[in-house]
């Protein structure tokens, strides 16, 4: 099973050239990512008892969902020019460092593993203390870029 991400609309490195439909789809996916992050934050605040049980990260499906959506945005930014260089450079290192984990999370959602040991566990992904802040910076940067483009287009439409 494979997934396809249609990122061909933004070819010159800017959301500015994305069609209205493309921007609407990006905003929809951003909303899903934001909702998944909020759900994960609630689950994280409630805590969990970590032990060696592979099911110990059972409540954190929202984390995998959030990461899978960030993965799509990250690949679109790095490989297909979704963000302008000005928007990408501040998060490039965070994005490049996060992408392997994001891809592993996406894979977990689209391919059912043969055993529980084959998937990345939330506790392992967060243990270093850097992963979660890095993901939040990436998340915030994509959200800000999309909001700015959306507002810019709304203002442009009022000027007509």
Where do the protein language model's features map onto the residues?
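Amphipathic alpha-helical interface segments
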Residues: 1-101, 116, 121-160
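Long, charged low-complexity segments
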Residues: 103-114
């Amino acid at each position: 099973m494979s997934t396809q991400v249609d990122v061909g609309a933004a070819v010159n490195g800017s959301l500015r050239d994305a069609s209205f439909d493309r921007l609407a789809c990006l905003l929809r996916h951003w909303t899903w990512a934001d909702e998944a992050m909020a759900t994960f934050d609630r689950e994280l605040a409630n805590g969990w008892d970590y032990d060696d049980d592979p099911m110990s990260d059972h409540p954190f499906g929202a984390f995998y969902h959030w990461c899978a959506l960030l993965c799509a945005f990250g690949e679109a930014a790095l490989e297909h020019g979704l963000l302008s260089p000005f928007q990408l450079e501040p998060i490039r290192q965070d994005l490049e460092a996060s992408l392997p984990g994001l891809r592993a999370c996406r894979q977990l959602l689209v391919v059912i593993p043969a055993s529980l040991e084959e998937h990345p566990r939330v506790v392992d992904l967060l243990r270093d203390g850097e992963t979660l802040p890095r993901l939040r910076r990436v998340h915030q940067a994509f959200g800000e870029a999309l909001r700015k483009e959306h507002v810019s287009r709304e203002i442009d439409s009022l000027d007509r």
